[in-house]
């Protein structure tokens, strides 16, 4: 019996008019083999715990199940602030939709499937290096609790693919609640296809925002929720030190899920001006610019939705973005510092925290984790991370005095142990540092995916101690801090 018999598949996007996509059959790679199979994720859909030959043939595009209808989506987008009408799935195909056992629907998307009408000058392929990075980062983000697409499988091959050098071709099976991007709406707006613009909005609301249907202004209510989800996502990026790198509108999910992992990086040393994409010469997508770019992208989406939503409603939603993001960011940072209440002087304490880390090139994740462990170690473990020890002592003294004013149930002070236990649930011990990904890539390019599997296991539960994997918590070596990541993938 086919493994797909136990899975509920649908083709709702492929049922839309062909103005939305082009049907394309995947072009198989040579000698495809398994690299990674996300067993825990697979079982949520009724798929086998262990991968098999049928799954390999199905998901690599060699023998598609009858309920798969592969299509390349058409969209547009603003890339580095410049509108590009000629975008679309240039190497990825939406195969079908698949429901979990609880009825939650996800797209099945095959990245690296070959040429499509939207490939432009590309070859339609994905390389193992970038596919491995996307697999690991999407699962790391899920482990952190940040809204994201997911990775179901990674397959390698013997097909040569040429970027800066010859690399192995690969396939990534990506799952997402939707692959509809801001750029889908821009495409229909700028080509005056207002009927299709409305149809897409109607379907997105029906599928993903059903609570908006009964409101007096469904489209305005929906856009307000898109603003809210985007603000939350970017607040999470800032709180966890994640730099996306390519925040073009065609890389923005309409659901506020982190989408299209390219030259991303998590901060090592805290640097608000950090630029992870070495092709971003002007720093448009630098770490500290992400909140501003989120609003810019939402404004571009608002313009595309202007045939459906009154100007006043669009402006009201956009006007709420900064406050929403700041509220989410403040909540997240309070949790990371173990401060449940808002008290006088907190603004200065937070500002001085970020300044201390930036001025001393202190590792962001490590500092917060050590701060979360003061119930079982002395203050020196935190102070030792900072070059200016006196500045660190001064800030830490202020912080501990402030933390001591937190009250729990029945008005009693919260103990150091209670505070630190809560902080360890939101301050990860493990993140996907670029040097760790690079080491996994080097093993995988030799056909060894065990290092990647170990790393994926740790990143799935990054708040746990994992004493057997302590090496993955190490700070990067000097070469690891200087890795340059490009958009080539």
UniProtKB/Swiss-Prot annotation:
Single GO MF annotation: ATP binding
Protein's UniProt keywords contain Metal-binding: yes
Reactions accelerated catalytically: L-seryl-[protein] + ATP = 3-O-(5'-adenylyl)-L-seryl-[protein] + diphosphate; L-threonyl-[protein] + ATP = 3-O-(5'-adenylyl)-L-threonyl-[protein] + diphosphate; L-tyrosyl-[protein] + ATP = O-(5'-adenylyl)-L-tyrosyl-[protein] + diphosphate; L-histidyl-[protein] + UTP = N(tele)-(5'-uridylyl)-L-histidyl-[protein] + diphosphate
Keyword Nucleus recorded: no
Chain sites annotated for binding Mg(2+): 251, 260
Cofactor: Mg(2+); Mn(2+)
Signal peptide, first to last residue: none
Coiled coil residues, start to end: none
Keywords: ATP-binding, Magnesium, Manganese, Metal-binding, Nucleotide-binding, Nucleotidyltransferase, Transferase
Binding residues annotated for ATP, in chain numbering: 88, 90-91, 111, 123-124, 174, 181, 260
Annotated catalytic residues: 250
EC number of this enzyme: 2.7.7.-, 2.7.7.108
Domain of life: Bacteria
HAMAP family: YdiU_SelO
Family membership noted in the UniProt record: Belongs to the SELO family.
Summary of the function given for this chain in its UniProt record: Nucleotidyltransferase involved in the post-translational modification of proteins. It can catalyze the addition of adenosine monophosphate (AMP) or uridine monophosphate (UMP) to a protein, resulting in modifications known as AMPylation and UMPylation.
Record's protein name: Protein nucleotidyltransferase YdiU
């Amino acid at each position: 019996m086919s493994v797909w018999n136990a899975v509920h598949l649908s083709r709702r996007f492929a049922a839309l008019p062909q103005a939305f996509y082009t049907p394309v059959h995947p072009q198989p790679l040579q000698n495809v083999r398994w690299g990674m199979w996300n067993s825990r994720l697979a079982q949520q859909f009724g798929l086998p715990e262990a991968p098999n030959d049928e799954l390999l043939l199905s998901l690599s595009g060699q023998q598609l199940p009858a309920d798969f209808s592969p299509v390349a989506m058409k969209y547009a987008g603003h890339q580095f602030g410049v509108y590009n009408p000629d975008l679309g799935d240039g190497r990825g195909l939406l195969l079908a939709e698949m429901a979990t056992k609880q009825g939650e629907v996800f797209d099945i998307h095959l990245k690296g499937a070959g040429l499509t009408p939207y490939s432009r000058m590309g070859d339609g392929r994905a390389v193992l290096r970038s596919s491995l990075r996307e697999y690991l980062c999407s699962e790391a983000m899920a482990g952190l609790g940040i809204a994201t697409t997911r990775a179901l499988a990674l397959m390698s091959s013997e097909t040569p693919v040429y970027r800066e050098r010859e690399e192995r071709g690969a396939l990534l099976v990506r799952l997402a609640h939707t692959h509809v991007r801001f750029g889908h709406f821009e495409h229909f707006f700028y080509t005056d296809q207002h009927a299709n613009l409305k149809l897409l909005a109607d379907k997105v609301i029906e599928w993903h925002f059903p609570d908006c249907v009964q409101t007096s202004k469904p489209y305005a209510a929906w856009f307000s929720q898109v603003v809210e989800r985007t603000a939350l996502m970017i607040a999470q990026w800032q709180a966890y030190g994640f730099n996306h790198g390519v925040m073009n509108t065609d890389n923005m999910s309409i659901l506020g899920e982190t989408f299209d992992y390219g030259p991303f990086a998590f901060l090592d040393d805290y640097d608000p001006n950090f630029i992870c994409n070495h092709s971003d010469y002007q720093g448009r997508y630098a770490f500290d610019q992400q909140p501003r770019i989120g609003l810019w992208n939402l404004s571009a989406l608002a313009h595309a939705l202007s045939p459906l939503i009154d100007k006043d409603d669009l402006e009201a939603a956009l006007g709420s973005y900064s406050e929403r993001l700041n509220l989410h960011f403040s909540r997240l940072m309070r949790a990371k510092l173990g401060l449940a209440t808002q008290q006088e002087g907190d603004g200065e304490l937070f500002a001085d925290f970020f300044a201390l880390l930036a001025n001393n090139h202190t590792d962001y994740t490590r500092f917060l984790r050590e701060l979360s462990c003061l119930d079982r170690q002395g203050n020196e473990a935190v102070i030792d991370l900072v070059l200016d020890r006196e500045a660190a002592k001064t800030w830490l003294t202020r912080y501990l005095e402030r933390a001591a004013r937190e009250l729990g149930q029945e008005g009693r002070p919260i103990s150091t142990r209670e505070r630190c236990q809560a902080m360890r649930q939101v301050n990860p011990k493990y993140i996907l540092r670029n040097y760790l990904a690079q080491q996994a890539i080097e093993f995988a390019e030799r056909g060894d995916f065990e290092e990647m599997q170990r790393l994926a296991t740790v990143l799935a539960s990054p708040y746990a101690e994992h004493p057997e994997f302590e090496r993955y918590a190490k700070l990067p070596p000097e070469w690891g801090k200087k890795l340059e990541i490009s958009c080539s993938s």
